[in-house]
């Protein structure tokens, strides 16, 4: 059961090129070795097959095709499978696809059902993805404005820091009584995307389902299942007046049935929008990238192809994207780590045309990239499974890479106090890395080493799975999904404290933010905790929002904007209104 439980975490799809087929009485299978994620298979023309994958027991046996079906039997009942399994074969574009007809063997069914196989010799060949750009209602936008005071332009704010001092936020608030609630506006649909702020506008995205019962499943669990919701969606971008909560405009970017599935804990609008005060950009995965001016006029839209993400070695699980776009120097930058065709992409913010595109040998990841100003120049840093990487954002050229991450990565890199902090939280690795921006080349640590010229310090077993870490006032805070909250000295890595947070409930997906010596934490059940920053843990208050919380708050001009499952709240002292 432990093996089967661990199987519910992975996915990869790879491409297939034409080859010579074996002669048999049914569907023609390739004679060469095939690859599917971490699995290698050989279907011998004589009727035997071998299938093996990293950390999996080998599956060997006999095969026979009849028409468009294949029957598989295991030698000696290997893997506890004595009966045959039957699968329908089809061409999936340039791939060979297996779809379940009947099979009582669970391990075989998990591996094979809905799988698409490629020639092993062709897996490293990454094809060009077609990117289609369309002009919108207006001519290209003006030159971008400089960062506005009080802006929170992307996920976790400037440089993904999550910090905005000078807010004078309250410690306590109550939506039921209205205490320190400036306004609350209902937002239709489902979304885990976070709010962003520029000037007097707050932007949020959503996906409105045609099924009124569409939902997601919060909580701490290991299931990797995709949601059964494939209902027709309307992907939306909303602009609200940040002073009153009034919806200023709303735009439908796309309508239709989703091209990809989503995780049962996910939505079809996970990616946070981004803005530079000139344009606001929303990315809806396979449904496209959309850029609007600040009045809601569509400037351009780009189809970057299928964005297929999921568990890295069980391709039947589709989880959907969560990485968010960022804007740097009029470039819209996207991190697209998918099943077979991973890349970084920089689009012209004025036209949507490709400025540069860098291919990546990566499995799916969900973190948002970060661009930071360093003493050695700007760096674009990405968190992913094979390597943490830094690039020159001007041209997409790689500057350095660091191995040792978890197989599933979601937190966003953070730049603070002249170091990059990058973590990931899937066992067994769960690393924390603190990296100097002067790093160049491959700076992967040799086994057993924790530091180097490039790595200030590192550790394993303490990285967070979903929440992005927080660097504040010389300390690093790491929040685990299960409510363990760790504090470290940023310079040395010394543990200051480890605290089990109260009211863990369904767990934590939202990332912590900080202002004026206080840290704000949101659990999925809708409880917001306020604690003091510093070497001593002190819990100041717990504030119930009465609704599920998955998104990360935004801070701007004395107000904290909190996105719940159904609403957007503005929290601040009444004098801020």
Language-model features: locations:
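Positively charged n-region of N-terminal signal peptides that target proteins for export
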Residues: 1-8
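Noncatalytic, solvent-exposed loop/strand surfaces
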Residues: 24, 78-80, 86, 114-117, ...
């Amino acid at each position: 059961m432990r093996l089967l439980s661990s199987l519910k975490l992975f996915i990869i799809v790879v491409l297939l090129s034409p080859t010579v087929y074996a002669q048999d009485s049914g569907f023609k299978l390739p004679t060469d070795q095939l690859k599917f994620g971490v699995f290698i298979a050989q279907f011998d023309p004589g009727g035997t097959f071998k299938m093996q994958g990293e950390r999996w027991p080998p599956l060997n046996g006999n095969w026979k095709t009849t028409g468009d079906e294949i029957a598989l039997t295991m030698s000696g009942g290997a893997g506890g499978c004595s009966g045959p399994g039957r699968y329908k074969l089809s061409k999936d574009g340039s791939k060979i696809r297996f779809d379940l007809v009947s099979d009582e063997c669970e391990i075989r069914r998990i591996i094979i059902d809905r799988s698409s196989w490629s020639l092993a010799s062709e897996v490293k060949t990454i094809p060009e993805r077609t990117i289609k750009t369309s002009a919108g209602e207006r001519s290209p936008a003006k030159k971008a404005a400089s960062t506005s005071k009080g802006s929170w332009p992307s996920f976790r704010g400037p440089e993904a820091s999550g910090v905005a001092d000078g807010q004078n936020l309250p410690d306590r608030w109550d939506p039921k009584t209205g205490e320190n609630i400036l306004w609350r506006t209902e937002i239709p649909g489902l979304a885990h995307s976070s709010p962003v702020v520029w000037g007097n506008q707050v932007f949020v995205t959503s996906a409105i389902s045609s099924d009124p019962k569409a939902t997601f499943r919060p909580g701490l669990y290991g299931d990797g299942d995709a949601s059964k919701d494939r209902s027709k969606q309307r992907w939306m971008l909303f602009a609200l007046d940040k002073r009153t909560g009034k919806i200023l405009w709303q735009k439908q970017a796309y309508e239709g049935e989703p091209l990809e599935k989503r995780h049962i804990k996910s939505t079809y609008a996970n990616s946070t929008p981004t803005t530079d005060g000139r344009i606001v950009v929303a990315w809806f995965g396979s449904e496209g990238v959309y850029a609007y001016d600040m009045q809601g006029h569509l400037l351009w839209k780009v189809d970057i192809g299928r964005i297929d993400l999921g568990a890295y070695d069980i391709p039947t699980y589709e989880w959907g994207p969560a990485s968010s776009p960022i804007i740097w120097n009029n470039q819209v930058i996207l991190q697209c780590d998918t099943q077979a065709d991973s890349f970084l992409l920089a689009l012209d913010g004025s036209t949507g045309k490709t400025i540069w595109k860098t291919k990546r040998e990566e499995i799916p990841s969900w973190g948002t990239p970060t661009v930071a100003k360093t003493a050695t120049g700007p760096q674009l840093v990405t968190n992913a499974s094979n390597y943490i990487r830094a690039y020159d954002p001007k041209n997409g050229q790689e500057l350095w890479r660091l191995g040792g991450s978890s197989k599933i990565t979601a937190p966003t890199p953070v730049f603070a106090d002249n170091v990059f902090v990058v973590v990931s939280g899937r066992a067994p690795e769960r690393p924390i890395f603190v990296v100097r921006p002067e790093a160049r080349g491959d700076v992967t640590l040799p086994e057993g080493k924790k530091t180097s010229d490039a790595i200030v310090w590192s550790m394993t077993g303490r990285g967070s799975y979903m929440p992005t870490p927080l660097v504040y006032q010389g300390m690093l805070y790491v929040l685990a999904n299960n409510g363990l909250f760790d504090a470290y000295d940023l310079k040395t890595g010394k543990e200051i404290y480890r605290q089990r947070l109260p009211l863990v409930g369904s767990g934590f997906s939202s990332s912590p933010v900080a202002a004026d010596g206080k840290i704000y934490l949101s659990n999925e059940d809708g409880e917001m905790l306020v604690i003091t920053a510093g070497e001593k843990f002190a819990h100041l208050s717990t504030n119930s929002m009465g609704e599920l919380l998955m998104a990360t708050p935004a801070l701007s001009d004395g107000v904290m904007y909190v996105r719940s499952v159904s609403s957007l709240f503005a929290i601040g002292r009444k004098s801020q209104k």
